[in-house]
Swiss-Prot record:
Oligomeric and partner information: Interacts with PLK.
Modification comment: Phosphorylated by PLK.
One GO cellular component, as annotated: spindle
UniProt protein name: Kinesin-like protein KIN-13
Subcellular location: Cytoplasm, Cytoskeleton; Cell projection, Cilium, Flagellum; Cytoplasm, Cytoskeleton, Flagellum basal body; Cytoplasm, Cytoskeleton, Flagellum axoneme
Keywords from the UniProt entry: ATP-binding, Cell cycle, Cell division, Cell projection, Centromere, Chromosome, Cilium, Cilium biogenesis/degradation, Cytoplasm, Cytoskeleton, Flagellum, Kinetochore, Microtubule, Mitosis, Motor protein, Nucleotide-binding, Phosphoprotein
SMART domains assigned: KISc
Naturally occurring in which organism (per UniProt): Giardia intestinalis
SUPFAM superfamilies noted in UniProt: P-loop containing nucleoside triphosphate hydrolases
Residue ranges of every copy of the Kinesin motor domain listed in the record: 1-240
Length: 439
């Protein structure tokens, strides 16, 4: 990889460690200057990952989490474990335990590549009330190869790459929308709901917040295109300014400004306004970074970019139903960009179907356990002459019918899921053939 996780997590000079040193030192001075104990602040750490469009708590054995919006539009991570720390070593121990649970895997360029976005949050809370004073988030983005480069990999790696690329494209779309909002009098819709990543990062992009993006690039000639793409990406972020009416405040941290200045200094101006900061690591190669042109150029269309994902379109008024029919990919297309987009959409659909089937399987198991209890009671009754043969036959027939119905329903769901996986395999093969014809 290009060093994203190394930059964020190195135990001596990583961003996590340096920021924690600064924050704890400032807290020591800050709390020492407060005469009232009710104003004392303590640091609280949480650590979770986004994998396959799902959130997992890395401090609680990868328990599933939910990202929900409250009445004020703020994103809340329900069920997230928070641990109070008193030293850098305590934070490193928590991170080490969390990293053992993080999703990693081999790719074409890295034998131990991060396959999830890892988010470490350090929140400052009042000791007496528990109210949050400010928060800083560190996002170590997943490493992902270009879509056309991972097609020869196994299905799991392909699906991981497609989901990662989708979230990075959603992040790029949010940055573009914020740029347009700054230029527009009325403001533009910002599609934060385009992915779980952008939902979680929402607080770091709007309101009383600052964000720094770290662009990691690889020093070799094979990564030249990816390096340029990442630099364009970072340049677009750097050009963002204050939004209209103070709605968007997207500030670039100044050289020499440390994490404690961000999380303590600025927040002190308004103790009633929770201050949030975000630090995002962006890699260049070998990854699929969305190609963002410089601000002075017109947006580049998907067809103008070789081996790059196209621009997604988001409908802010769309409310997803509880379930939806199986996705039908356009396998017959010959345009590689269209095929990659179709593959990305299909993978997204497969992840959603997987969730539905897992829940259906859980319901089927619960139903079977209840039916087994009824069957055992019925068997005990007939053995002890507590029920007539006719009643026993009727009740046993009913139990067997309900078992059969539950199994048939689950098998139908599995059949549809297998078809979606087969279509993913066929589409991946089509992309391989299309790429081979171009060589």
């Amino acid at each position: 990889g290009s060093g994203k996780s190394f930059t964020m997590m190195h135990k001596d000079n990583g961003i996590y460690v340096l920021a924690c040193f600064d924050i704890l030192e400032y807290l020591r001075v800050y709390n020492g200057s407060q005469g009232n104990n009710s104003k004392f602040l303590v640091p609280v750490v949480s650590f979770f990952e986004i994998y396959g469009g799902k959130l997992f708590d890395l401090l609680n054995n990868r328990q599933r989490l939910q990202a929900l919006e409250d009445g004020k539009g703020n994103v809340q991570i329900t069920g997230l474990t928070e641990k109070q720390i008193s030293s850098v070593d305590a934070m490193l121990n928590l991170i080490d335990s969390g990293l053992t649970l993080r999703a990693v895997g081999a790719t074409g360029a890295n034998a131990d590549s991060s396959r999830s976005h890892a988010i470490l949050q350090i929140a400052l809370k009042y000791t007496k009330s528990g109210k949050e004073y400010s928060r800083i988030s560190f996002i170590d983005l997943a490493g992902s190869e270009r879509a056309s480069d991972v097609q020869n990999s196994d299905r799991q790696t392909r699906m991981e790459g497609a989901e990662i690329n989708k979230s990075l494209l959603a992040l790029k779309e949010c940055i573009r929308a914020m740029d347009k909002s700054n230029d527009s009098k009325s403001g533009a819709h910002i599609p934060f709901r385009g992915s779980k990543l952008t939902m979680v990062l929402r607080d770091s992009f709007i309101g009383n917040s600052q964000t720094v993006m770290i662009a990691n690039i690889s020093p070799n000639d094979k990564s030249c295109d990816n390096t340029l793409n990442t630099l364009r990406y970072a340049d677009r972020v750097k050009e963002l300014q204050h939004g209209k009416g103070g709605i968007i405040k997207f500030n670039v941290l100044k050289m020499g400004q440390n994490a404690a200045d961000v999380i303590l200094g600025t927040a002190r101006d308004d103790e009633n306004d929770v201050y949030k900061a975000g630090i995002v690591g962006v890699n260049a190669a070998p990854s699929q970074q969305a190609r963002v042109p410089p601000a002075s150029q017109a947006p580049i269309t998907a067809r103008q970019i070789q081996q790059n994902l196209p621009q997604p379109h988001y409908n802010p008024n769309y409310n997803p139903p509880n379930s939806k029919p199986a996705f039908e990919p356009r396998v017959e297309t010959t345009d590689e960009d269209d095929m990659v987009r179709t593959h990305c959409d299909l993978v997204d659909s497969i992840y959603e179907q997987e969730d539905l089937i897992v829940r259906a399987h859980r319901r089927q198991v619960d139903s079977m356990m209840q039916l087994v209890k009824e069957e055992v009671a019925l068997l005990h009754a007939i053995e002890n002459d507590q029920v007539s043969i006719d009643d026993w036959l009727v009740k046993l027939s009913d139990i067997l019918s309900r078992k059969e119905e539950a199994i048939t329903t689950l098998k139908g769901n599995l059949s549809a899921f297998k078809q979606a996986l087969q279509k993913e395999e066929e589409l991946s093969h089509s992309i391989d053939l299309n790429k081979a014809r171009k060589k």
